A protein has these predicted regions:
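Structure-specific DNA junction-binding interface
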Residues: 1-78
Length: 78
């Protein structure tokens, strides 16, 4: 997932990934921590695409990115 996040950053798509990285860095997270958090937001989308053959849900991904560093969608797993 980290490679996917890095590719999204390189492509600046979706733009929310770059915005989230900058926001997390400005609030004291290291780059590695920020990438890990972004990957946590990406994980549910990748699971739905790979395991459930669903379309990538950009709206939900963006909503999860906006909630970082909180990860309520992970429940007790975080």
């Amino acid at each position: 997932l980290f490679e996917v996040v890095e590719n999204q950053l390189a492509d600046n798509y979706p733009k929310q990934v770059t915005e989230t990285l900058m926001r997390l860095r400005m609030t004291g997270h290291s780059r590695d921590e920020a990438i890990e958090l972004i990957a946590c937001a990406l994980a549910p989308e990748m699971i739905d695409v790979i395991e459930h053959q669903q379309s990538f849900n950009l709206e939900r991904y963006a909503a999860h990115l906006a909630q970082l560093p909180e990860t309520p969608w992970l429940g007790d797993e975080a």
